[in-house]
């Protein structure tokens, strides 16, 4: 049962990843997802990095999986991620304010929910 769930999560992430990659040009992409665990994210990163588009490898600087429930309370309403651990990114309905980061493209949980 656990392996089946992991397989579903992997495919779910791959579909989301490639779907948004083709529309994000060469932006750094952040996927924020509440289903995915670290092992799955690592697989997705490897799959995307080994894929090709227009003859060039795709490199994603950041793929972050986050559960909104796992985020510290203070991170839920915005602010700067510079002071947060690497595995956290701020989620809100508005685009977060970034200072010392190079994040160009953010997919929020609510956006994924709407798309599904």
Swiss-Prot record:
Ranges annotated as spanning the membrane: 5-23
Further comment found in the protein's record: Partially overlaps DCS1.
Q: Highest lineage ranks of the organism?
A: Eukaryota, Fungi, Dikarya, Ascomycota, Saccharomycotina
Localization terms from the record: Membrane
Keywords, in A-Z order: Membrane, Transmembrane, Transmembrane helix
The UniProt entry lists membrane topology as: Single-pass membrane protein
Gene Ontology CC: membrane
Can you cite a GO biological process for this protein? Answer: ascospore formation
What is the name of the protein in this document?
Putative uncharacterized protein YLR269C
- Source species, domain of life: Eukaryota
């Amino acid at each position: 049962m656990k392996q089946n769930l992991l397989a579903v999560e992997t495919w779910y992430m791959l579909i989301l990843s490639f779907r948004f990659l083709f529309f994000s040009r060469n932006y750094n992409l952040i996927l924020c997802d509440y289903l995915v665990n670290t092992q799955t994210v690592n697989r997705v990163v490897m799959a995307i990095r080994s894929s090709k588009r227009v003859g060039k490898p795709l490199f994603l600087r950041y793929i972050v999986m986050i559960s909104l429930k796992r985020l510290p309370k203070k991170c839920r309403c915005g602010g700067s991620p510079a002071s947060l651990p690497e595995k956290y990114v701020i989620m809100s309905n508005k685009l977060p304010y970034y200072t010392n980061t190079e994040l160009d493209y953010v997919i929020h949980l609510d956006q994924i929910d709407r798309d599904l």
